[in-house]
Amino acid sequence: MNVDLRLIVRLLLAILLTSLVTTILMGKQIHRRLVKSMVKTTGEKDSLPARQLPKREISPKVADFPPPLTLNQTELDILKIQRNNSFRLPQQEAIKEWQDAIFFKEDSNRRGLGEQGRAVQLPNAKLNPDDFQDFYAELSDRIPLNRSLPDTRPISCRKRKYLENLPNVTVIIAFHDEHLSVLLRSITSIINRSPVELLKQIVLVDDDSNLPELGQQLEEIVAQNFPKIIHILRLPERRGSIKARMEAIRVSSCQVLVFLDSHIEVNTNWLPPLLEPIVINPHIVTRPILDAISRKTFAYAKQNTMTRSGFNWWLESESLPIFPEDKSPDSTPYRTPVLSGAMAIDRNYFLNLGGFDEQLDTWEAEKFEISFKVWMCGGMMLYVPCARVGHIGKRPMKSISSPGYHNFLARNYKRVAEVWMDNYKKYVYDKNPKLYKMANAGLLFQRKTKRNALECKTFDWYMTKVAPDFLKRYLALDSPLVFSGVIESVAFPGFCVDSLNCRHTKPVVLARCTGHNSMPGEHQNWSLTQDHEIQLTNSKDDCLEAQGLRSKSVWLFRCHKNGGNQYWYYNHRHRWIQQGQIWVWCLEAQLASGHKVGKVLANKICDKNQLEQQWKVGRNAPYDPQREPH
């Protein structure tokens, strides 16, 4: 009898367990059916019914896991500039599979218009060249808001697990006149592909949009579908993305802030890889790899090349190869001197740094300000290959009005340079002296005081420790091989090498020097870089090039960084500008008596008695015989 009773009890327990598992699975299936119920739109801006969007509940976070393996500040300071050994974050033990296997499987089986990130073309679709959005809005309206995407992560990411106890997140999206279906697709992808335990809040900041559908219609969609997770913040006047994001931070409530654009689609399991490094040390800032979404076809394309983000002295973004010690495996986060676009950062650390500089106007320079600030003030920035976010690529923006200043880029760049770049700021100003002289950077006392209070490192530390290859690629400070400024003839005082603004069409000439040492004339301002190129300082890619054999003229051509006829060396002892790597040819001035314009010739055999081959160069490299070894 006792045996029969035990069997009955076991059967009852088995039935209860089976019922519990079935309930959980059915709950997930119900949620997925809500997602599947989303239908394609008809192409009209007002035909985006709220029922297309899945409802999402926020589950309370309950966890009591073993502590993660972390880095203290001293360990982080050592790791972030490490060069001799492979760069690795601590390998964690208490790990969890965060990827939703059921959703991933269903997503991979979907077919239809735009599904799997495939290109879509409408026969009669046209792009208005004056369209603010600069993409096919009609096409976006046809593609499902919750469309499936290809898994573009490296293979090694697909089996990777992450810490069980990760912080919750506020996603911040600032927008101005974003097309409604594009904005809703951004939101839908975030909600569908983020663990409910982690995604607590999305703050949408409307930066004074004019499109009517972004008003009441957006409010109704959010109220009906996401009342507990999405908060819409309306700004009464246009303030720019920098100030808009800071307004969102003030209403955020989570431990980690994630900044995203309003025209994105997040990919599979994108969030946990961004959060784990922040748990290891809250001074680590992370960014996903940005895949490309075509503005014409909405095709989703993988970004294959792993690069770091950098800048030139125009403060334009540059892509640079990653350090050799950061290269493998391809699922490992790696260091980058600059982060742009999307970003995940610990809220307390961000606010302790002073947040974004709200005196930066509209957009753009904040990526440099936050990057310099993080690296120089105790933090580290990482790209995370296992986190992928698709981004609609738009053409370079046309000139737009600024809510606060008529030339906001010059103001922004000067403000960042004055606060963070120390002596290196002159290389930014050298690119356009007149512009930066007129630019008003605003009041800087508070930002400089904050930097001093944080005991941040110098910009020279940043250039030599964080981005040492910048000094090889671009103009270096106080290098014996480098000059910046005029190239004045010793034989013909007051005459300088002049491009005459005839790029690629005529040779450079010897002409009367214009300007003065502290501000050379626009067409007489030259820089000898550590690539041994003599660049026209006010142009980012025009270099002096010797033409043909001996006694030939010198022209201005596009810089190619391959040496050869664009390779120059300044010999301080003899004041020669030598051409080529055998150092037997010299630049020579020729000026006939009574003439106002002379010739600049290359490939003349160097002769120390030939005064026409001697040049006074720049304002950073005065003649000093002790600096010349031969």
Swiss-Prot record:
Which cofactor names does the annotation list?
Mn(2+)
Binding residues for substrate: 207, 238, 262, 363
The segment annotated Catalytic subdomain B runs over 333-394
- Report the CDD domains cross-referenced here: beta-trefoil_Ricin_Pgant8-like, pp-GalNAc-T
Q: Positions of the region Catalytic subdomain A?
A: 166-277
GO BP terms, alphabetized: protein O-linked glycosylation
Superkingdom, taxonomy of origin: Eukaryota
One Pfam annotation reads Glycos_transf_2
Compartments, as annotated in UniProt: Golgi apparatus membrane
Any GO molecular function:
polypeptide N-acetylgalactosaminyltransferase activity
List, for all copies, the residue spans of the domain called Ricin B-type lectin.
Answer: 483-618
Expression tissues: During embryonic stages 9-11, weakly expressed in the mesoderm. During embryonic stages 12-13, very weak expression is observed in the somatic mesoderm region. No expression detected from stage 14-15. During embryonic stages 16-17, expressed in the epidermis and the antennomaxillary complex. In third instar larvae, expressed ubiquitously in wing, eye-antennal, leg and haltere imaginal disks.
Q: Which PROSITE patterns match?
A: RICIN_B_LECTIN (PS50231)
Pathway, per record: Protein modification; protein glycosylation
Any one GO CC term of the record: Golgi apparatus
The similarity annotation says: Belongs to the glycosyltransferase 2 family. GalNAc-T subfamily.
Record remark: domains:
There are two conserved domains in the glycosyltransferase region: the N-terminal domain (domain A, also called GT1 motif), which is probably involved in manganese coordination and substrate binding and the C-terminal domain (domain B, also called Gal/GalNAc-T motif), which is probably involved in catalytic reaction and UDP-Gal binding. The ricin B-type lectin domain binds to GalNAc and contributes to the glycopeptide specificity.
- What name has this protein been given in UniProt? Putative polypeptide N-acetylgalactosaminyltransferase 10
Source species, please?
A: Drosophila melanogaster
